Amino acid sequence: MAEKEHYERTKPHVNIGTIGHVDHGKTTLTAAITKVLAAKGLAKAEDYSDIDAAPEEKERGITINTAHVEYETEKRHYAHIDAPGHADYVKNMITGAAQMDGAILVVAATDGPMPQTREHILLARQVGVEYIVVFLNKTDLVDDDELVDLVEMEVRDLLSEYDFPGDDVPVVRGSALKALEGDPEQEQVVLHLLDVVDEYIPTPKRPTDKPFMMPVEDVFTITGRGTVASGRIDRGTVKIGDEVEIVGLKEDVIKSTVTGVEMFHKTLDLGEAGDNVGILLRGVSHDQIERGQVLAEPGSIQTHKQFKGEVYVMTKEEGGRHTPFFSNYRPQFYFHTTDVTGTIELPDGVEMVMPGDNVTFTVELQKPVALEKGLKFTIREGGHTVGAGVVSEVLD
């Protein structure tokens, strides 16, 4: 086996992604960014079709959840996630958005904000993406600047509605397609957008001092080497020789030792919070670990089935339920990277919960999940997100 290239950590690392309505140009912008930076030797140009193919691979039994591309600016190293726009991929948006320190919201000036624009802003708010930069795309197709101004105002209002600083959020106008096609003026716009991202989205303070924890997104086997769990390190650090536990979904906890850490197919001395890595585990078979579990420092996190959640229930207009729900309602709770069915018990004096309500209720999960206070989750029903919340208290 050829010796892997070593990944050198020289610049601060930031996770970002493109969000927004289907066909507004998220993937075109992602491709344009890699192309423009590749010309400066800071990225490998990725074809639109390669990036766009990521969501399709689910059907063929391979779980590639979102397209990951990497690039650098003069100041930073970025891992960029392109979250597919279709409702079918909301689950991926949830695992994807959870991995963003900031996001580029792409809005087509020809359309203005659309239903998924709103849904992605809501999801960004709920999964803790605190910084959004707006790219108003396709501005070359709008003759009247005042119309573009109007769209910008609408986007700012929408961001403010979800507690983002709508008045202060930077907005860049341009054409991702023209940049991708090599228009020099639009290539400069893309570089300007990246400067804005460099400046506006702060380098996150990584919780590297906390105990190691990584939600498992995918599991695969490398012949002759063993089982690899991949995901984004939530907190702490991990290196070869570390003891870890596989926690969640099952009653028993499995202990293992880390025998390899890789990032972007390169070996890594130390994986730390925020890195997307593959972790090779000693003595663990493929069927002993699954998506939705977590890898954690031994003893640092426990499984629970009962918790109190602070929840926002989406309105019909946001794509949520059309009708209220009552105690004993049994939706899916999406934790870390997987759905678990749970039964809701409403507090005394609350007869029912209407779409649009904020509510605190108790949940009894069917399977144990690695839980703690502050963990975010979404509530889903029939493949649609109907609410989002945060664990306010663990009860068992």
Swiss-Prot record:
Question: Which domain of life does the protein's organism represent?
Answer: Bacteria
For this UniProt record, give its keywords in alphabetical order, as a comma-separated list. Answer: Cytoplasm, Elongation factor, GTP-binding, Hydrolase, Magnesium, Metal-binding, Nucleotide-binding, Protein biosynthesis
The UniProt record lists the tr-type G domain at: 11-205
Q: Which gene encodes it?
A: tuf
Top-tier EC class: hydrolase
Write out the GO MF terms: GTP binding; GTPase activity; translation elongation factor activity
Disulphide bonds annotated for this chain are none
Q: Where in the cell is it found?
A: Cytoplasm
What is the native source organism of this protein? Limosilactobacillus fermentum (strain NBRC 3956 / LMG 18251) (Lactobacillus fermentum)
Which reaction is catalysed here?
Answer: GTP + H2O = GDP + phosphate + H(+)
Region spans: G1? 20-27
Entry protein name: Elongation factor Tu
Where Mg(2+) binds, per the record, is at T27
Which EC number(s) does UniProt give? 3.6.5.3
